[in-house]
């Protein structure tokens, strides 16, 4: 299928050929000069009309040619928008299907009109078991933290280490080194 610019070029060629054929000299077939002059005036008027019509057609074709790139750009943009809409609709459809699946799962587990199935009961048991294990692990972590504190205190007492004194010495050394390097101690 030819595109619009090929069709327009073809029409221009036909119009140009029509102009060339109209400019051929007229043959003198008439018997008297009056009829020949009348025929020349008639053909001159019709030639002027044809030329005006041809110029008008050429102007309209030029106008169409100038609008053609804009139309192509609009079609391209519409295709992109159409593709984006298709993608959005596809995503919405997927989300809707996911929500429906989730609704079915939730409604089967919570629906008071449906008895508790074996699957639901098993799931509930697993959740309760995990909650119980989580509680036990929290207790054990707290116990381990307490044990570490107790062991640290016992170690410090056995070796006669004054933890507060050690911390104060380290802080004093840092302040001293900052003072030597010329750093401001208020940057903390």
From Swiss-Prot:
It holds the Pfam family FlaC_arch. It is found in: Archaeal flagellum. Keywords: Archaeal flagellum. Transmembrane segments: none annotated. Its main location: other. One of its GO terms (cellular component) is archaeal-type flagellum. To M.jannaschii FlaC. This is Putative flagella-related protein C.
């Amino acid at each position: 299928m030819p595109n619009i610019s090929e069709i327009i070029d073809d029409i221009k060629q036909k119009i140009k050929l029509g102009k060339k054929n109209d400019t051929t000299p007229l043959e003198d077939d008439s018997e008297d000069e009056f009829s020949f002059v009348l025929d020349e005036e008639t053909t001159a008027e019709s030639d002027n009309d044809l030329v005006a019509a041809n110029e008008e057609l050429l102007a309209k074709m030029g106008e169409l040619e100038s609008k053609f790139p804009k139309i192509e750009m609009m079609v391209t943009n519409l295709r992109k928008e159409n593709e984006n809409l298709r993608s959005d609709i596809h995503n919405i459809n997927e989300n809707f299907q996911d929500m429906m699946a989730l609704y079915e799962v939730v409604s089967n587990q919570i629906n008071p009109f449906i008895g508790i199935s074996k699957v639901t009961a098993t799931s509930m048991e697993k959740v309760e078991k995990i909650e119980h294990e989580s509680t036990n692990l929290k207790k054990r972590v707290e116990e381990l933290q307490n044990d570490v504190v107790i062991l640290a205190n016992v170690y410090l007492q056995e070796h006669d280490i004054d933890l507060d004194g050690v911390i104060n010495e380290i802080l004093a050394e840092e302040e001293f080194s900052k003072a030597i390097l010329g750093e401001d101690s208020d940057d903390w």
